[in-house]
Amino acid sequence: TRELLHLVTEGIEDYEFLNWKSQVFGVEGNGGDCAYSNSYIQEGAKVNARAYIEDSYLYGETHIAEQCVVSGVTLKDKIVPAGVTLHGLKLRNGKFVVRVYGTFDNPKGFLADDAPFLHTTMKQMPELLGLSVEEIWGAEEPYLWFAKMYPVCDSIEEAVTAALELVEVLAGRQKVSENYKNAQRMSLYESFNAADTTQMLAWQENLEKKIRISRFLKAIDERKEVAEAALS
């Protein structure tokens, strides 16, 4: 994740000879400088220039801070703190999970090494989450990759809310809820393997259509060549 963020926000100039761009097919209502790909960022949503948005729809008073990566989610009136990555997945059972972690965290982080995670460390996680080591890792080795932290939700909006609440809990700014402790939770590993790639592709295609229509209407409104609407 950190390598991707660096490439699209700072290192893209090194690849200009390949015609690579930091903004690839999207709508940015504020005309900002953030990096994005196949994303719709409505006017009013603010994204730091050192953030990257992918396959996402941002609207309302959404604010994305620096060094964030946001992928596969819908955000309305949400604040994503600096250095946080959100990655939304639709599962094969029709449910949703939003994985959240620090942009510079290592999924291979190990409990015994007290590896950093978001605003805390892995040894502090059980107390902050109100869960035992066994409840978080079960029979798996205690790597971050296997930690069951992400609630399974009925909608992407609920999953986003749950993910951002997890950020607040691990930062010590909010107490963990009983709903969280009692929820079905998945790890990075489990959610990756349970993802419905067909539905994720459908979401990307529907978002692309929305972007294309918006660019088409904007081109007409600004009296530009309509062909520009199809350009990335």
Name the predicted role of every residue range:
Residues 1-232:
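Left-handed beta-helix
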